A protein has these predicted regions:
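Active-site-adjacent substrate/metal-binding segments within catalytic domains
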Residues: 1-69, 77-100, 238-267
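Short, charged/polar micro-motifs that form catalytic or ligand-binding hotspots
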Residues: 43, 124, 193, 197
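Substrate-binding clefts and catalytic carboxylate motifs of secreted carbohydrate-active enzymes
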Residues: 101, 136-139, 148-151, 155-164, ...
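Flexible loop/turn segments at secondary-structure boundaries
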Residues: 11-13, 45-48, 67-70, 107-111, ...
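Active-site neighborhood of glycoside hydrolase catalytic domains
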Residues: 55, 70-164
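Generic enzyme active-site microenvironment
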Residues: 61, 104, 207
Length: 267
């Protein structure tokens, strides 16, 4: 047994053109990254991925397929979840790389944030899955692998920095820090409020998620967009941004200044 004092990991997301990427390419990329772990959410990777992580000594955090929402607890849906969990656990439980099963991504945390803001603490539908059904199946099928009911989780607030894991979205999203049980301020949207320098305020024991929106490669934009829309102020460009279209302006304003060309935006 060895205690892990530092973990450097990356999210592993299914590529839209996965069929065009060879196993050899994937293996080479993972070797180049020199990581100690990978987190999977949004899908269950195939056996090749887990075999490769076994070979490279990477630890895998595997989410079940729930995120950021209420989920039914009726008999039909529960039976479907049971079948899915049994199928995936039996397939993956013998991999040495499997370090942790996680019940969901952000369901408890987002529910708590919304309740603190609105004052409406409607019970979270889906807790029966994360607190009873899934851990019950794991106790029977894979009692050796740790289970985490959700991410983030721990402490007096699911996203508390006091214990457990934390999703740090003060930077970019403006989510107020939660050093203990409650958010310390209102949501931020100003350049100062969402600045990357606020990472210094994070005292979390384990930060399992953070990030800033990044632009795709210029070649990708040119491939898919009308040439007339290749400008950071065009409606066609802004409409393709998944998050609030002007959110990046606050990040760039005090660091690089606002972009004048699409190349500026990408850079």
């Amino acid at each position: 047994d060895k205690t892990v004092f530092e973990l450097q990991a990356r999210d592993w997301r299914k590529s839209g053109d996965q069929a065009e990427i060879s196993g050899k390419q994937i293996a080479e990329w993972m070797r180049q990254l020199k990581l100690s772990g990978a987190g999977n959410y949004g899908y269950y990777p195939d056996d090749f991925f887990f075999d490769l992580c076994d070979e490279l000594g990477l630890m895998v955090w595997q989410d079940f397929m729930f995120a950021c929402a209420h989920y039914p607890e009726d008999a039909v849906f529960t039976a479907s979840v049971r079948a899915e969990v049994e199928d995936q656990v039996l397939r993956l439980r013998n991999h040495a790389c499997l370090a942790l099963w996680c019940g969901n991504n952000e369901s408890q945390a987002m529910h708590r944030i919304n309740a603190d803001i609105s004052g409406d603490d409607t019970p979270l539908s889906g807790l029966a899955l994360y607190d009873d059904l899934i851990p019950g199946l794991l106790r029977m099928l894979d009692p050796e692998t740790p289970y985490w009911p959700g991410s983030p989780w721990g402490g007096p607030n699911p996203n508390s920095m006091r214990s457990g894991d934390v999703h740090d979205w003060t930077v970019w999203h403006g989510v107020p820090p939660i050093p203990d049980a409650y958010m310390t301020e209102a949501f931020a949207s100003s350049p100062k409020g969402v600045a990357y320098t606020r990472y210094a305020e994070d005292t979390a024991r384990f930060v399992s998620e953070f990030g800033i929106q990044g632009a795709p490669a210029l070649e990708t934009l040119r491939r898919w967009m009308d040439p007339a829309d290749l400008h950071p102020e065009s409606s066609g460009f802004l409409a393709r941004i998944k998050d609030e279209a002007r959110k990046a302006d606050a990040m760039m304003a005090t660091v690089t200044g606002l972009p004048e060309t699409i190349q500026d935006y990408v850079d």
